[in-house]
Every structure is written in C-alpha cells, then in structure tokens.
Amino acid sequence: SLAYLKDKMSLFTSGGAREIAADGCERVVIARECSAEDTRTICENCPVEVEVFAHGALCMCYSGQCGMSALIGGRSGNRGRCAQPCRLPYGVNAPAKKAYPLSLKDSCLAGRLEEMGAMGVSCVKLEGRMKRPEYVAVITRIYARLLEEGRGPTADERAELEQAFSRSGFTDGYWRGRHGAAMFGTRPENAPDPKDLFEEARRAYERDSLRTVPVDLSCSVSAGVPCTLTVSDRDGHSVTVTGPVPEAARTRALDGLELEARLRKTGGTAFRCADCAAQVAGGLFLSAGALNALRRDALSALEEARCAVPHRRELPVPPLPEADCTAEAPRLTISVTRLEQLSPALLELGCPARVYIPLEEVSRLESLPGEGPEWCAVLPRVWRDRDEPALRTLLERARALGFTGVLIGNLGHLPLVRGLDFHLYGDYGLNVFNSRSLAYLKDKELESACVSFELRFAQIRDLKKVLRAEAIVYGRLPLMITENCLVQNETGCRLDRQGLCVPEDGPCRCGQPNVLVDRTGAAFPLLPAYGHRTEIQNSKPLYLADRPEHRRLGLAYARLRFTTETAEECVSVVQNYLDAAPAAGDFTRGLYERGVE
C-alpha cells in the first residue's frame, strides 16, 4: 500500500519532501498555497510522488497550522473537525459587517492539468468531504475526462463545475502566484440550484456508458450437488455463491454455450464480463430464472466485497525509548516578536532558560542582547525553496553571534539547518499530540519539543516524554498563518519585484498595528509574517500563572509567548509567573482544561 503524507503536514519545499521520503513515504500532498513554480521545483528535486490539490474548498490558513477552529469553535481543524470560522463575517480594522475577508473561493485547476503533467505531478486531489455524492460524481467525471483526453475544460464543463458548487466563481490565484482580494468570495443566496445537474449525475449511474469493472466468471454445474459461480475482479476480490441442485433434463439439457450466455448478461451493473468459464455435466437442467438469480447474487456479493472496509493489518509497533521526564517544575522560556520587547530588566528578572528570537530579527543584532539564557533563532513558519539561500545566510550570522539553538516548526527546516552545529528544538507547528511524535522527533535529533496547545493538561501529563517537552503557558495563541496579507487585501497595496510592499495611496499599514474584528467585537491582532504573510493572534492572552497544574505535568520548559506586548508588559508578565500571581484583565485558559473535539 502507498504511504503518503497529507497537506496537513504543511510541506511546501523540496527539502521537506526529501525529508519524508527518507522516512519511507512515497507520496506527498503539497500545500494548497504552492504556485506552479513551487510545484515544479518540488517535482524536480524530490524522489517521491507529488499530489496537488486541484479542486475544492481552500482553507484560509495553511492546512495543519490552524488554531482558530479549536480555540473559537471548539473543534480541531488540524484533526479534521473544522468549525469553518473562515466563512463568518469579519472586519479589518473595522467592525464586522457583511465582509468576509477569510472566505476564499474554491480552487479550480481544471485548466492546469496538462501543465501539471508536464512538470511531473503524479496525482490530483479533488475535495469531496461533506459534499453530496452527486457533487462528487460531477466533479470526478469532468476531471477524469480531461485527464483521459489530455485537454482543458470546455465552457460547458466549466459551467457544470461552477453550478455543482462555487463561491462567486473559482480561483487559481495560488497556482498563478497572484494573491489578493480577487481570490475571495462567498456562496451567493441566489446561486443556481444544481438540481437538474445532480439528477443527471444520478441517472448516469444506470447507463452502460459508465466505466465498468472487468470480472472473470467461473461456473460449475454437476449432478447431485448445488451449482456454484465464482466471480473475481482484477483487484484481488473473489466471491463464490451457490445455487440450486440441477434437475435431470426432461427435454432439452443445459449446455455450456447457453450457460455462458446467461452469465455474461451483466448489464445494469457496475461490472462487465471479461472472461467466462462454464463446466456443465451432460443431461442436466437449470431454469433461466435460477441462472439469472445465481449471477445477480454473485455480482451483488462481489460489490459488497469491493465496498467492505479492508482488514486492518497489525503492524509491529516498536517500544518507546525510556522517558526523559522530570519531577521538577519547568524552567521558563521566552519568545519575542520584536527585539524591542527584550530589556535588561526582563533578562535579569526571569533568567529564562532560553530566549527565542525570529530569524529575521537577527539581521538587526550586532551582538547578543545579554548573557545567561540560551539564545535560539526561530525559523519562519512558511517559506519557499527560493528563500533558503537568504535564510541560510541569516542562520550562519546567528551562529557567529553566539546563537546556539534553532526552533524547528516544520520538517522542511531540518535540511536547512543541518551542518550548522545548532541544538534543535521543536515548535508548536510540528503538532505534537502523542508520545510517538516525541519519539519521531528524537530520532530526528531534536532535543526538546513544544506540545500542541490543543492538548488537555491530563493528556500532556500522560505523554511518555521520551524527549524533553515544552508547552506554551502564556501569550496570544496563533490562530492562523495565511499566504494572503489581510491588510494588503483591504488597502490595495502591491508587492514590488523585491517583495516590498508598495502602498497605493498613503502610507503602508501592513507593518502597523492591525486587527481582525469578529461579530462579537473581539479584536484579533494581525502580525506580519515572513514573506509578506499574515499571522492572526487570539484576541485574549493565555494566562496560567495562577494554575499550579502546568507545573506538575512533567514538562521541562514553560514558554511565555510575547506578541503585542511592550517591553514593560513583558517584564510584568514574567514577574507574575515568578509570583504565581492571580489573573487580571481579559484572558483565556486556552484548551488545556476544556479540551477540543
């Protein structure tokens, strides 16, 4: 069977694809945000099959990196239970009215299939999750036809795709590398009813023109025993059914030709007879009705066998290594968004075990901000192959300055940092949900890993900590990392050839304080991310200083995550955690106590 990684692994570089190939995976579903250029680079530089998301709903966030559904809707989008907060109204720096800045149109790459084939794409993915069977039939039929005939869609086929489901049309913006407001849309209230189209799809199941499954039939008719019919397909399924005991012929005996003719009548089913073997003893008789019933029973049994859930194979599970658990209280670590959040008072007060600084901020440093903690560079959550030379240069600069650790949030980071003599620590983007994840990362030579903030306290406690574990205990939790810049979509800014933002009218707001406002008035800070992307933060900071539970979970590190805080506020938070001070102001306990579906 094929071992492949879904798009929830957030793989978008050839280095990430090679990393999973080394682990035995044979196919990777790359991120939906990948452009044609990105896809070609991955196809040319990795040894595994590449699958591209070609048709269906687009998540606003990089798949596998969304905390919005869990923290706001109580359902984990990272584990397939998305509550679809993207489809709700929001305002950017304004009250939420009838704007939908997170609602992307569905992707449609039907006109790009030949281009994909030429660059080496092995498979296209068509989304059918939570859709009607008729929708799946319409979409699959058109894409299969285009692939078989090696062409693009006609105007009528495009109209059928849109009628089946769309949100004010489709987009191929990611594929073309063209982001912006044109990629967004909602399902209009007056959308055409696909009733007739879906009815036609239902009727098509009954037509002979549908692709059928070739089967081999073997029938035996002998005196004194029930007749038998065995039907086999080319996928290894085989069934045998029995019929009545044949009678002695009174007038005309059954012969092999008549028996074969009866068995070959598979019309109206999903099967066609490819080969038929009939063995009939002389002087016997079976009625036409009995033979027809025998054939129907056999084909029905084969259909059930093909639809049955495959037998779950028991694979050997290697034992976990010894746990690296500690009974001591976790040591504090600190992550900042900007260098301005660091101050001598902060470093002296908390004496953190580690300080995490975005790699982009390293270029602003002339020397380490202080002594005592271990200084760690945080790699961008999202980047592309073309960015890696610049990132490698920044990593070398960080090493020369005295940084000794790197925070890894994606498997594609690993080939980027190898050979630079850094200690490797896992970030929350790796989605550590269980002990096996920790063991896997230990095999990758990581020395610690931050567990998912979707876990409950009890689940974190029960982890077999074969690797030193860290958890976020303070800060605005990241809700989304988006390829589209939400502020740019509102202001009309554009990017120049150097990737710098050029405002259309007035000063650029992309790097200024911006918020996303929901229907309740909650404001979610929008922070700029590497590559002119956007990271949406929760409206309330997580606060656990007064909850002793997080100190009794076997964690080695507890992270204070600073995003929008001033330098003074950072110092105050550290002091609160040292004093186990009670909560004040607007805050959240996250999912550590209430959990998530």
PLM-predicted stretches and their roles:
Residues S1-L5, S14-Y428, V432-E597:
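Surface-exposed amphipathic alpha-helical tracts and adjacent flexible/coil segments at the periphery
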